[in-house]
Amino acid sequence: MNFPWDQLLVKGNWMITMAQIGAPFLVIGLIAVITYFKLWKYLYKEWFTSVDHKKIGIMYLICAVLMFVRGGIDALLIRAQLTVPDNKFLESNHYNEIFSTHGVIMIIFMAMPFIFGLWNIVVPLQIGARDVAFPVLNNVSFWLFFAGMILFNLSFIIGGSPAAGWTNYAPLAGEFSPGPGVNYYLIAIQISGLGTLATGINFFVTILRCKTPTMKFMQMPMFTVTTFITTLIVILAFPPLTVALALMTTDRIFDTAFFTVAHGGMPMLWANFFWVWGHPEVYIVILPAFGIYSEIIPTFARKRLFGHQSMVWATAGIAFLSFLVWVHHFFTMGNGALINSFFSISTMLIGIPTGVKLFNWLLTLYKGRITFESPMLFSLAFIPNFLLGGVTGVMLAMASADYQYHNTYFLVAHFHYTLVTGVVFACLAGLIFWYPKMMGYKLNETLNKWCFWFFMIGFNVCFLPQFILGLDGMPRRLYTYMPSDGWFLLNLISTIGALLMAIGFLFLVVSIVYSHFKSPREATGDNWDGLGRTLEWTTASAIPPKYNFAITPDWNDYDTFVDMKEHGRHYLDNHNYKDIHMPNNTPVGFWIGIFMTIGGFFLIFETVIPALICLFGIFGTMIYRSFQIDHGYHIPAAEVAETEARLREARIKEREAVSHES
């Protein structure tokens, strides 16, 4: 075994050197805090090995917020470099590494875990399930994601980050990118992608088989509908990515030639593989985001969602078309007029079902009794901003015009107007909206609104000038420019906008910390002044009981809970409760994640034997699990009755208080 020790440390960059010095102290400090407060046993037994979908969801969200910080720092470094002409703040290769990792982190390790966290917390509650279909697999999926996240972030201080862009095109990512950087990209995304594929299968089966029997597909809440359709995209889109990553890994480590022209390979094969996954990936994160908006807008408009069935069909239409547009990402690569024309038309067609959704949200708002809580503000801001992203997308869909726009900042502005307003706004809105369901108290609304205004205004100040920069010819991925180019003022404005966005995010962090100590606790579960419309608001707050529902709820309309409250009925009346069967926690996912992290690290540095040993460790863990006799455990009926009685008493007090105020 010849480990390449000479590649381990990145040298010659003061910023990376500071990170290399600071990272060990950060890890030691974290270990010291956990040890001092004697939290190791608690964390291992209650969180790391938990199969409770709600706790797994919270772990996803914690990781997503941390990756938001990391990706945001990358973005600020990019803007700092481009603020003034001929800047020497970053050298070219380091700049390439930063924009490459920024894209991967924000899409793979921020947006997706944010969405998966909300899936885990909300979807089983919305369909009346006690857990997901495969609780152990859910735990394994999280740790696979976590292993990929850790590996990818190690690249900054050990070995060097990938510098071939988030698309990692061959041959740039092949013979022109020596060292472990691209290997980090391939292995980390491969491991995380396996967890994503498992999550997609898990939630597909959960929604199909674990929903309450009286709930029909067209009666499901829109967040659950968009989740179900998204799982189909995950199941169909991730295998091509898995194959592509595996092929490029063998090219780099075992000297095959799938993407190397000199030996008969096809670099364009990578582009097709990548975007067959890459464009559906956009809808993997944006369709659940549409589902979030479809929950928030009716809640704070105090109206039924307009055109529920058309929203379902529009979601299905977008999912179908998402697999027919991938070539628009490389119109400029010589496909020919006929192929470009087909994919140009199919790209424009996506605007039709998306337009249906936009009009339905607007008609839901029409004559509604709207209140402007912070989740609603994000949802309202999404509509006009996303529309701008969509209109510029149609401009880019015109293949002939795309030759002018494609490699400029016009494209950068376009996809940020779609992904930030479509996904990031939704993630922040969803986090605030369902935060009481996780923690039992609302985040401070004043701080939330400061977060919204800084983030939304900063976003437009940052990215609107980039449309003009693109039309003025500024290429994307450019690490510096000359004063004579005339781009200084717009780049300065763009950087100011990025700083405003960072301040907005800091307000959210302050809100989380402040609310932990100051916000009043709520036990009733229907936390937004009794405006909840779906099943999750019928359960207790502060991580609902492990069993979620003491009895199987009835559900015959997507607004059933509103009807029940109007008629004074709820699910918490006295019942003859029975013992409830639940799955046991398991360490399997945690140890598979550890083996994956260690094995992946050795494979990144092309040291195969230790990686194989870790692979045997993974198989051994799986064999150990297969021979376990684990029948789970039962929550006694008396304990269920006591828990439900407390919740019923809290609900009665809430209704009495509301009646007294009125």
From Swiss-Prot:
Q: Which EC number applies?
A: 1.10.3.-
Matching Pfam families:
COX1 (PF00115)
Give the main EC class.
oxidoreductase
Q: Where is this cross-link: 1'-histidyl-3'-tyrosine (His-Tyr)?
A: H279-Y283
- What reaction(s) does this enzyme catalyze? 2 a quinol + O2 = 2 a quinone + 2 H2O
Instruction: Identify its membrane topology class.
Output: Multi-pass membrane protein
Q: Which SUPFAM superfamilies has this protein been placed in?
A: Cytochrome c oxidase subunit I-like
State the needed cofactors, names only: Cu cation; ferriheme a
- Keyword DNA repair listed? The answer is no
Q: Which InterPro entries match?
A: Cyt_c_oxase-like_su1_dom, Cyt_c_oxase-like_su1_sf, Cyt_C_Oxase_1, Cyt_c_Oxase_su1_BS, QoxB
What does the Swiss-Prot or TrEMBL cofactor note state?
Answer: Binds a copper B center. Heme A3.
Pathway stated in the Swiss-Prot or TrEMBL entry: Energy metabolism; oxidative phosphorylation
Similarity comment: family membership: Belongs to the heme-copper respiratory oxidase family.
Write out the function statement from the record: Catalyzes quinol oxidation with the concomitant reduction of oxygen to water.
Matching entries from NCBIfam families are given as: QoxB
Name the chain's protein.
Answer: Probable quinol oxidase subunit 1
Q: In which organism is this protein found? A: Staphylococcus aureus (strain NCTC 8325 / PS 47)
